[in-house]
Amino acid sequence: MIDIIQEYWKSLLWTDGYRFTGVAITLWLLISSVVMGGILAVFLAIGRVSSNKFIQFPIWLFTYIFRGTPLYVQLLVFYSGMYTLEIVKGTELLNAFFRSGLNCTVLALTLNTCAYTTEIFAGAIRSVPAGEIEAARAYGFSSVKMYRCIILPSALRIALPAYSNEVILMLHSTALAFTATVPDLLK
């Protein structure tokens, strides 16, 4: 085992200045997908707890599909399947985007973590004590100010343990980037 580590450690950590190391690409995949997915998830979670069914149903369907299919299948759909569509080949921007394995991997990881994080944040918003919401209404807070100052800070504290587990699972999931020809830690 030590022989293997001594032989390959330089290729994992050292760079010649032109290429990123496998560790750097893995961390970049993790950070970019978690940040983009987390930002999207906050807005989707607010819509998910909405009483309006026209807002709530599409978000539920999105989370149902992305949580119900394996990440490997999602990655293959974005990497191999999307490029076979004529609209993707015909549009220059989409063609350039879906031709890159790195872009497809970031998109699949972002949407996957967004679906899981949306449900985590929606559950946290639902579990904010009713007394806090009632107090905000008594002070005359608007809905936007109530979400910004009372509900979201409290919900994010509630969601932190489950969200940290999601970040760890996303770190594990970055290993699938190798299937889309992204030279990550497994290069």
Where are these regions (language model features)?
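Transmembrane alpha-helices and adjacent helix-loop boundaries
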Residues: 1-187
